[in-house]
From Swiss-Prot:
Protein's name in the database: Recombination protein RecR
GO molecular-function term, one example from the UniProt record: zinc ion binding
PANTHER family, per the entry: RECOMBINATION PROTEIN RECR (PTHR30446:SF0)
Lineage summary: Bacteria, Bacillati, Actinomycetota, Actinomycetes, Mycobacteriales
C4-type zinc finger locations on the chain: 56-71
Organism the protein comes from: Mycobacterium leprae (strain TN)
Length: 203
């Protein structure tokens, strides 16, 4: 254990996902060795993220405005919505350059053991979007692109059950090919692109 501010910094860094005690200590001592202006720059960026970044009121993606860049782009196909778990998954799909529709970010996946049920996710907002016209365009297809793990599959099954009786709506699921138990964000562009192109109809 170190003393005072150094240990406090290590403790706070250790709370970040994927950062263990040794990594936290290494980062802390790196920060102690850099120029003061570098620390000031990092601090300013963190404060700006805290103050300026919000969630898009339409899709739930991160944004610095009410509507994110994708929802504001009139060239995107508003009739097709890709449902993902987290904002990082939006970036994973965007990297494939295979999808020109819009997104809906759930904010997680169903996980009863962790206390995450449908009420904790943005499922109600998805149903509302489907029931209304956005930019004078109705949604005709929902692509479910949750992670290929237990929670993601449970979420996909629940969504299919909620959406299957909606008239004029096609519900699809990205094709198999992604490793079971993996995350969308770690899939390479080619594999994820093929999974999107080869999506299968559920309803």
């Amino acid at each position: 254990m170190f003393e005072g501010p150094v240990q406090n910094l290590i403790d706070e860094l250790g709370k970040l996902p994927g950062i263990g005690p040794k990594s936290a200590q290494r980062i802390a001592f790196h920060l102690l060795s850099v120029e003061p202006q570098d620390i000031d720059r990092l601090t300013a960026v963190l404060v700006k993220v805290r103050d300026d970044v919000r969630f898009c009121t339409v899709c739930g993606n991160v944004s610095d405005d009410e509507r994110c860049r994708i929802c504001s782009d009139t060239r995107r196909d508003a009739s097709v919505v890709c449902v993902v778990e987290e904002p990082k998954d939006v970036q994973a799909v965007e990297r494939t350059r295979e999808f020109r529709g819009r997104y809906h970010v759930l904010g997680g996946a169903l996980d009863p053991l962790s206390g995450i049920g449908p009420e904790q996710l943005r499922i109600r907002e998805l149903l509302s979007r489907i029931g209304e016209r956005v930019d004078d365009v109705g949604i005709t297809e929902v692509i479910i692109a949750t992670d290929p793990n237990t929670e993601g599959e449970a979420t996909a099954t629940y969504l299919v059950r909620m959406l299957r009786d909606m008239p004029g709506l096609t519900v699809t699921r990205i094709a198999s090919g992604l490793p079971m138990g993996g995350d969308l964000e770690f899939a390479d562009e080619l594999t994820l692109g093929r999974a999107l192109t080869g999506r299968r109809t559920m309803v």
